[in-house]
C-alpha cells in the first residue's frame, strides 16, 4: 500500500460525508401544489356555472321563439315553425324544440 492511499481514502470518504450532509441539511418541508386538483376544482365551478347560464339562455331563447312562432308549419313546411297560420313567416330555426 502506498503512503498516500489512506489519505486519498479519507478524502473521498470526507467528500461523500460532506455531500450527504449538504443534501440532508436543507430539511424544509415542501408543500406540493397540485395544478390538477386545485385548478380542476376552480374550473369545474366556473364550467358548471357557465353551462347552467348557457342552458338557461337556451331555454329563454326557446321561450321567445315559441311566442314569436306559435304555429307549426304543414305541407311543404312540415317541421317548420311559423309566425302566422297558413305557413306565414316560417323558419326552421335549429335550436327550437317544441
Curated annotation (Swiss-Prot):
It is found in: Virion. Induction: Expressed in the late phase of the viral replicative cycle. Transmembrane segments: none annotated. Residues 3-23 are annotated as: Hydrophobic. Keywords: Capsid protein, Late protein, Virion. One of its GO terms (cellular component) is viral capsid. One of the minor capsid proteins that constitute a network internal to the major capsid proteins and outside the lipid membrane. The minor capsid protein P13 does not serve a cross-linking function between neighboring capsomers, it may play a role in the viral capsid assembly. Interacts with the major capsid protein. The hydrophobic region might anchor the protein in the underlying inner membrane. This is Minor capsid protein P13.
Amino acid at each position: 500500500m502506498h503512503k498516500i492511499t489512506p489519505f486519498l481514502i479519507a478524502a473521498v470518504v470526507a467528500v461523500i460525508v460532506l455531500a450527504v450532509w449538504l443534501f440532508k441539511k436543507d430539511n424544509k418541508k415542501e408543500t406540493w401544489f397540485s395544478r390538477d386538483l386545485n385548478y380542476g376544482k376552480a374550473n369545474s365551478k366556473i364550467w358548471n356555472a357557465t353551462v347552467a347560464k348557457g342552458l338557461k339562455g337556451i331555454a329563454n331563447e326557446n321561450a321567445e321563439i315559441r311566442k314569436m312562432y306559435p304555429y307549426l308549419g304543414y305541407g311543404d313546411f312540415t317541421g317548420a315553425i311559423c309566425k302566422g297560420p297558413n305557413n306565414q313567416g316560417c323558419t326552421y330555426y335549429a335550436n327550437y324544440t317544441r
